[in-house]
Amino acid sequence: MTEMPGWKHVYSGKVRDLFVPETAEGLTETDTVLVVASDRVSAFDHVLEPGIPGKGELLTALSLWWFDRLDAPNHLIPDHTLEGERARERIPAAVSGRSMLVKPLDMFPIECVVRGYLTGSGWQEYQESQSVCGLPLPAGLSDGDRLPEPIYTPAWKAPLGEHDENISYERTIELVGAETAGTLRELSLAVYGRGAAIAEKRGVIIADTKFEFGAERETGEITLADEVLTSDSSRYWDAAATSDVYTPKERMASFDKQIVRDWLAANWDRTGTPPALPAEIVERTAGRYRALVERLTGA
């Protein structure tokens, strides 16, 4: 991990590392957090080896691009609000391009998942019960089909190393209260809707995604945090491949880490330590991440 004068490491997740000013006691005693996106890649609740070259920069670029367009309160520290110093000038050169300065929030233990299309674990559950997370769906749907309306299917955010757990909306009420649960659902569906509309204009489908929210410590405002609509948190498909002339597999060719998931599913039984990713899988995944950023942002 990179040593950075003036900052101290306080936490590492699967992909991101958190730092606070060296004078702060910790996350609860600071108004500024440096979030550094690494090149680590995770799947099936495991961090894999090797990482994906350039992934941290691509995730950060995409999150910043989306935060600027989604019209939702977010945890970024505006560049002009730090006294006597612009926010971007506080970011150490060693992690420039893969870092964000953010406000600390009281995070909710909920993964706010929105599905616009039936696929992944939702498709598996639908085949058994014709529902997803307790929400009944029409009969006769196939893998990759667009849902009549996007659905909100929350999950309990497990500690690092444990499995996230799909939960009912009623369970979210028990965890965070009825008012907060309702706001999380409303915000998640609204942000997904705005993001999906923007992406479709650029020839990309957001099949599903997950958001994380926290409460502002001073005002209590529910605020979008962590990453947003990245290749790690979302399934992205090429809109040009959705016509009937393509096979289901071709229609769902993704701009995300589905390549990694598919390779692991075919080469690992999910017991013990996952195998190292082959160079070809690493290169293909990096290429898809870059292609998405280029498609969406034009950069």
UniProtKB/Swiss-Prot annotation:
Membership in a protein family? Belongs to the SAICAR synthetase family.
Q: Which UniProt keywords apply?
A: ATP-binding, Ligase, Nucleotide-binding, Purine biosynthesis
What Gene Ontology terms describe what this protein does at the molecular function level?
A: ATP binding; phosphoribosylaminoimidazolesuccinocarboxamide synthase activity
Q: PROSITE patterns attached here?
A: SAICAR_SYNTHETASE_1, SAICAR_SYNTHETASE_2
Tell me what organism the protein belongs to: Leifsonia xyli subsp. xyli (strain CTCB07)
What Gene Ontology cellular-component terms does the record carry? cytoplasm
Q: In which pathway does it act?
A: Purine metabolism; IMP biosynthesis via de novo pathway; 5-amino-1-(5-phospho-D-ribosyl)imidazole-4-carboxamide from 5-amino-1-(5-phospho-D-ribosyl)imidazole-4-carboxylate: step 1/2
- UniProt cross-references to InterPro entries, sorted A to Z: SAICAR_synt/ADE2_N, SAICAR_synth, SAICAR_synthetase_CS
Q: Which domain of life is it from?
A: Bacteria
The Enzyme Commission number assigned here is 6.3.2.6
GO terms (BP aspect): 'de novo' IMP biosynthetic process
Q: What class of enzyme is it?
A: ligase
Reactions that this protein is recorded to catalyse: 5-amino-1-(5-phospho-D-ribosyl)imidazole-4-carboxylate + L-aspartate + ATP = (2S)-2-[5-amino-1-(5-phospho-beta-D-ribosyl)imidazole-4-carboxamido]succinate + ADP + phosphate + 2 H(+)
- Protein name, as recorded: Phosphoribosylaminoimidazole-succinocarboxamide synthase
